[in-house]
Regions:
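Transmembrane helix-loop-helix hairpins at the membrane interface
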Residues: 59-69, 84-187
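Juxtamembrane helix-loop-helix connectors linking adjacent transmembrane helices
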Residues: 2, 9, 20-22, 26-94, ...
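Compositionally biased non-globular segments, especially hydrophobic aliphatic-rich helices
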Residues: 18-21, 147
């Protein structure tokens, strides 16, 4: 064969040339990482083994029983646990609410030094966010119901502050909603 180029050039992958793809992808800018961290969108330490988190999980059934005083008990049949209505109430609403309230609102409030002041683990940012969270529920619920919602809201904010992440708050909120709506969501 002569030194002429081949009339059928080989694809780069077949010529032995290599290049690393990761070197062409720039790392995320530090400001983006800071924004995500401020919103609580970062991986938390092992919250599922934390005694405070486990206590809040254990208190869930007591919260459900307290809240069922405002509703008749109508447990859902097992097949209804896959219904769009149940998935919305137990999964999608807690996800949206936690990203909005504990991620954006509480995350933004925590940027202020004064809002980081805490009493028994409850920051001022958590307290104000929980009040806002409860007041939003007043649009469709009674004052008594909003007060009952305020207590779990403080718990969700507490774990957001404790772990610096919204993921534990989302997990706890999903658990609370799933338990509650499985008790009262049936007809």
């Amino acid at each position: 064969m002569t030194g002429k180029p081949s009339p059928w050039p080989l694809h780069r992958e077949h010529t032995g040339e290599t290049r690393t793809i990761s070197s062409t992808v720039p790392p995320p800018p530090s400001y983006l990482i800071q924004i995500l961290a401020a919103l609580g969108l970062q991986s938390p330490r092992s919250f599922h083994r934390d005694p405070a988190f486990l206590l809040l999980v254990a208190l869930g059934p007591m919260v459900w029983l307290a809240m069922t005083g405002f509703s008749a008990l109508h447990p859902l049949p097992w097949q209804a646990l896959r219904s769009p209505a149940f998935l919305s109430a137990a999964l999608w609403q807690p996800l949206f609410e936690e990203l909005l309230f504990r991620g954006i609102v509480q995350g933004y409030a925590l940027q202020s030094r004064g809002m980081q002041k805490a009493w028994n683990g409850i920051t001022l940012a958590n307290l104000l966010t929980s009040l806002l969270f409860s007041s939003v529920h007043l649009t469709s619920h009674s004052i008594g119901w909003a007060f009952l919602i305020f207590v779990p809201a403080l718990c969700f904010g507490f774990v957001r502050d404790r772990f610096g992440s919204v993921y534990p708050a989302i997990a706890l909120h999903v658990f609370y909603n799933a338990g509650y709506f499985s008790l009262v969501g049936g007809t």
